[in-house]
């Protein structure tokens, strides 16, 4: 099984979620990524090397952006989670 590492921004985002069902959907998405990181889509252009997984909840699209570092056991670093609106602009600023 792959090792999942959450960035501090990701940890803060998850901690701030008060809706239990949304938190469960995001945790389920993280479990899917841990089991098989190819479940997301590979990014191109400025974000080459990153992957993202869409989570739909209550008519809102959330993105989980992550990077895979191949080591002895693959390590998946979740860089950022947020709503789709302005997500990639904020991600590029974060990086």
Please state what every model-predicted region is.
Residues 1-29:
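Arg/Lys-rich, positively charged N-terminal/basic patches that mediate binding to nucleic acids
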Residues 3, 57-95:
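Enriched for short, Lys/Arg-rich terminal
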Residues 8-12, 48-51, 76:
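Positions in alpha-helical segments
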Residues 12, 32, 86:
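Active-site micro-motifs of SAM-dependent methyltransferase domains
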Residues 16, 32-33, 81:
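Conserved catalytic core of Hanks-type protein kinase domains
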Residues 18, 38, 92-93:
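A generic structural signal for secondary-structure junctions
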Residues 31-58:
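A short, surface-exposed loop/turn module that caps and links secondary-structure elements
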């Amino acid at each position: 099984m792959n090792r999942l590492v959450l960035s501090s921004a990701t940890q803060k985002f998850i901690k701030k979620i008060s809706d239990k069902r949304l938190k469960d959907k995001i945790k389920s998405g993280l479990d899917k990524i841990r089991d098989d990181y190819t479940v997301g889509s590979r990014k191109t252009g400025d974000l080459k090397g990153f992957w993202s997984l869409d989570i739909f909840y209550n008519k809102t699209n959330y993105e989980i952006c992550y990077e895979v570092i191949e080591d002895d056991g693959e390590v998946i670093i979740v860089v950022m989670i947020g709503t789709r609106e302005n997500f990639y602009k904020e991600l590029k600023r974060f990086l």
